[in-house]
Regions:
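Glycine-rich adenosine-cofactor-binding loop
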Residues: 1-17
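Active-site flanking residues adjacent to catalytic metal/cofactor-binding acidic residues
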Residues: 3, 113, 137
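Flexible, glycine-rich phosphate/dinucleotide-binding loops
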Residues: 9, 31-32, 142
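Short, well-ordered alpha-helices that flank and scaffold nucleotide-derived cofactor binding pockets
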Residues: 14-18, 101-102, 156
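Residues at the starts of beta-strands that form the adenosine-phosphate
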Residues: 21-22
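Conserved acidic E/D residue at the C-terminus of a beta-strand in Rossmann-like folds
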Residues: 27
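Rossmann-like adenosine-cofactor binding region
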Residues: 30-126
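C-terminal helix-to-coil terminal segments
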Residues: 119-174
């Protein structure tokens, strides 16, 4: 399920579709997006509850609005199947973080997050210490030389990883 069918949601859907995943898009304007490439099905927010129990992956790519603020809460998360995943590349306030932590302790398989209700994420947040949570910076912009710097950092860290050396920029929980 991809919640948000703007340019980012559409790009994500095309990638998931290429991997033979059944992609359900959630949007405010179902009629406008009914034939959008990459989506097998398009539904509105009111119909979303029917699709949640069959959803293995929820990808948030929506704007923060009155409708999406706190959308991913305990009621939503409790309907997801055992072992499902949440990916948030939207806005932190779309997710109730306390409810997410509870769901991760009970039945979610994991979460991939680059946005949080309060940024930066508090150093004492339990999300930092959860082994099935991936946290990354929310970077939408690039600068001259960005790709080269990322490639060099990746290669350096790959070499370090393969030789058992510490990685650069790795966060270690205290």
């Amino acid at each position: 399920m991809v919640i948000g069918m703007g340019p980012i949601g559409q790009k994500i859907a095309r990638i998931l579709s290429a991997m033979d995943m059944h992609v359900v898009g959630v949007t405010r304007d179902e009629a406008k997006h009914r034939t959008t490439e990459g989506f097998n099905q398009v539904i509105d927010f009111e119909s979303m509850g029917q699709a949640i129990p069959q959803t293995q992956y929820v990808v948030l790519a929506c704007p923060l609005t009155c409708q999406t603020h706190g959308l991913i809460n305990g009621a939503f998360l409790s309907q997801l199947p055992q072992g499902s995943f949440l990916i948030n590349v939207a806005r932190g306030q779309v997710v109730n973080q306390n409810d997410l932590v509870e769901a991760l302790h009970s039945h979610l398989g994991g979460a991939f997050l680059d946005v949080f209700a309060t940024e930066p994420l508090e150093s004492d947040s339990p999300l930092w210490r959860m082994p099935h949570v991936m946290i990354s910076p929310h970077t939408a912009g690039h600068f001259t030389g960005y790709a080269e710097k990322v490639a060099l950092l990746f290669m350096h860290n790959l070499n370090n990883y393969l030789s058992g050396q510490p990685l650069l920029n790795e966060w270690q929980p205290s």
